[in-house]
Amino acid sequence: WSFVFAVLMGLAIVIAANRFFREGNEDLINWVSVMAFIGYGLMCTNFIRLVDIIPERAMYFVEAEPEMQKAMLAANPLPLDPTSILTFGFVGFWVLVINFVSKDKGDFPGYLSILGMLVGVLHIFVALGNLLQMQVLISIAAGLGGIVLGPIWLFWFGVLLKKERYP
């Protein structure tokens, strides 16, 4: 459930970032924000399925007769986003674009822009890793982006947005 919570917090960041970066780039920021909403929404759905539906199915599978187990294996539902383009790809593109746009904002730290662009690329690595069937890209993205740099960027960006809103 922690991933579901993190994704819901990501949706809140999209709203705040949209307001922060909209001036001078309204159409672009609105467009990538919609992409982020789609990505985070699908991520949330996938994570809920992982923690709720799949364990329940596993319980039924273990208790089922062999014929039913075969049927359950054959009827395994397809993931909502098997390539991760709509989830990690869309969110990564949003992170990349808002941080690229932030370079032109005088009150936005340059190091945060660079860190954010790297985080965006690492999100996109998940989709590329799935498309190219290269587990190493997914592992790099999960380790470096998901555990280390992503949380640092989100925290720093959140502090900056809070300062801008409540100086």
Residue map of PLM features:
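Hydrophobic, aromatic-enriched alpha-helical segments typical of multi-pass transmembrane helices
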Residues: 1-167
